[in-house]
Curated annotation (Swiss-Prot):
<dbReference type="GO" id="GO:0000053">
    <property type="term" value="P:argininosuccinate metabolic process"/>
</dbReference>
<dbReference type="Pfam" id="PF00764">
    <property type="entry name" value="Arginosuc_synth"/>
</dbReference>
<feature type="binding site">
    <location>
        <position position="279"/>
    </location>
    <ligand>
        <name>L-citrulline</name>
    </ligand>
</feature>
<dbReference type="InterPro" id="IPR048268">
    <property type="entry name" value="Arginosuc_syn_C"/>
</dbReference>
<dbReference type="GO" id="GO:0004055">
    <property type="term" value="F:argininosuccinate synthase activity"/>
</dbReference>
<feature type="binding site">
    <location>
        <position position="123"/>
    </location>
    <ligand>
        <name>L-aspartate</name>
    </ligand>
</feature>
<comment type="similarity">
    <text>Belongs to the argininosuccinate synthase family. Type 1 subfamily.</text>
</comment>
<keyword id="KW-0547">Nucleotide-binding</keyword>
<feature type="binding site">
    <location>
        <begin position="13"/>
        <end position="21"/>
    </location>
    <ligand>
        <name>ATP</name>
    </ligand>
</feature>
<feature type="binding site">
    <location>
        <position position="267"/>
    </location>
    <ligand>
        <name>L-citrulline</name>
    </ligand>
</feature>
<dbReference type="InterPro" id="IPR018223">
    <property type="entry name" value="Arginosuc_synth_CS"/>
</dbReference>
<dbReference type="GO" id="GO:0006526">
    <property type="term" value="P:L-arginine biosynthetic process"/>
</dbReference>
<keyword id="KW-0436">Ligase</keyword>
<keyword id="KW-0028">Amino-acid biosynthesis</keyword>
<dbReference type="InterPro" id="IPR014729">
    <property type="entry name" value="Rossmann-like_a/b/a_fold"/>
</dbReference>
<dbReference type="GO" id="GO:0005737">
    <property type="term" value="C:cytoplasm"/>
</dbReference>
<feature type="binding site">
    <location>
        <position position="182"/>
    </location>
    <ligand>
        <name>L-citrulline</name>
    </ligand>
</feature>
Length: 407
């Protein structure tokens, strides 16, 4: 796609790393545009002040470095976990759910600064380009979007390094060769892809895992915690109320120490190819188990099964980048309605990579001791009623059987 030539000012999603620093300078030299940078603190665990200083060094006048951790967990992660969203049976969507938040801030900053375009550093092979751009267009249909990886003429890492040297962009010594794999991280998870991970038959090296210790190295004694919920959202750990971001960070610590949340998967990208990734979602893995457990005693069977039926579609919408679509918002309204009575506390045992639910309690529980007891239920349930229930449900099966036996 040809570069827009009428761009005067562009907001760049800027990490401060080599690639986005090269993109920054490329936007200045190729488009002659004024560049505004946006760096988000999503809980990736990196000091962000160097990104500000690097942007200043590259001549940027308008620099936005924002702590969005609470917004990320409260408005994006928690709504997603109310749905128990999992893509292709295993992926907890840690990268996918961060992209609409970044796009939202890019659009807001573009409006604030009078920019007519935004830019991102996603490659032309991945899902992130789609997620960034669908989200941006949903919020501003007239915004111009620049994706340098699809447009520039660099063919190799050497070309990038030569450009960096030509424009006096600092290059760390460990960046002069190919990185062994690429990493994306936020408060929910970290993902590692590419290079040493491209052969799906070969086990990932241990050094790839940065958020969790190996289950083999985890403590020999289990850790027991209690997670409290209110209207479907986790609100406390061991009775202590916490903000959304603090709660998730605390669960991450418990998960990391017990080797929880590792995932090696091959997923189907939206753009059509399969990719292998090594993901770590320690806190999210605990949160999902706890949320399903509290739902098990507070959700009606019909509501629970309907949620499970809809979940794959909801997860797919997030994975594909349709967070701001009307269908995702419609599903969210239904999901949020289901969470009105999802409150209580879940007890979990964490041990060597495993999350085991050992207890759940709620004032809104639908679990009845009187109904399920093996002892005298004092008339709460008349077992004779089951005969008619079974006969009615068997009617169509018996009718089919009679027809088939008479062939």
């Amino acid at each position: 796609m040809a570069l827009p030539k009428d761009v005067k000012k562009v907001v760049l999603a800027y990490s401060g790393g080599l690639d986005t620093s090269i993109i920054l300078k490329w936007l200045q030299t190729e488009l002659g545009a004024e560049v505004v940078t946006f760096t988000a603190d999503l809980g990736q665990g990196e000091e962000l002040e160097p990104a500000r200083k690097k942007a200043e060094m590259l001549g940027i006048k308008e620099i936005f470095v924002e702590d969005v951790r609470e917004e990320f967990v409260r408005d994006f992660v928690f709504p997603m976990f109310r749905a128990n969203a999992v893509y292709e049976g295993v992926y907890l969507l840690g990268t996918s759910i961060a992209r609409p938040l970044i796009s939202k801030h890019l659009i807001e900053i573009a409006k604030k600064t009078g920019a007519d375009a935004i830019a991102h550093g996603a490659t032309g092979k991945g899902n992130d380009q789609v997620r960034f751009e669908l989200s941006a267009y949903a919020l501003n249909p007239d915004i111009k979007i620049i994706a340098p990886w699809r447009d520039w003429t660099f063919k190799s890492r050497t070309d990038l390094l030569n450009f960096a040297e030509q424009h006096q962009i600092p290059v760390a010594k460990d960046k002069k060769g190919e990185a062994p794999f690429s990493v994306d991280a936020n408060l929910l998870h970290s993902s590692s892809e590419g290079k040493v991970l491209e052969d799906p038959a070969v086990e990932a090296p241990e050094y790839v895992h940065m958020r969790t210790i190996s289950p083999e190295a985890a403590p020999d004694k289990a850790t027991v915690i209690k997670v409290g919920f209110r209207k479907g959202d986790a609100c406390s750990i061991n009775g202590v109320e916490m903000s959304p971001a603090t709660l998730l960070a605390t669960l991450n610590n418990y998960g990391r120490e017990n080797g929880i949340g590792r995932l090696d998967l091959v997923e189907n990208r939206f753009v059509g190819m399969k990719s292998r990734g090594v993901y770590e979602t320690p806190g999210g893995t605990i949160l999902l188990a706890a949320h399903r457990a509290i739902e098990s005693i507070t959700l009606d069977r019909g509501a629970a099964h309907l949620k499970d039926d809809l979940m794959p579609r909801y997860a797919e919408l997030i994975y594909y980048g349709f967070w701001f679509s009307p269908e995702r918002e419609m599903l969210q309204a239904l999901i949020d309605k289901s969470q009105e009575h999802v409150e209580g506390e879940v007890t979990l045992k964490l041990y060597k990579g495993n999350v085991m639910v050992t207890g759940r309690e709620s004032e809104k529980s639908l679990y009845s001791d009187a109904l399920v007891t093996f002892e005298d239920d004092h008339g709460a349930y008349d077992q004779k009623d089951a005969a008619g229930f079974i006969k009615l449900n068997a009617l169509r099966l018996r009718t089919l059987a009679k027809r088939n036996l008479n062939k």
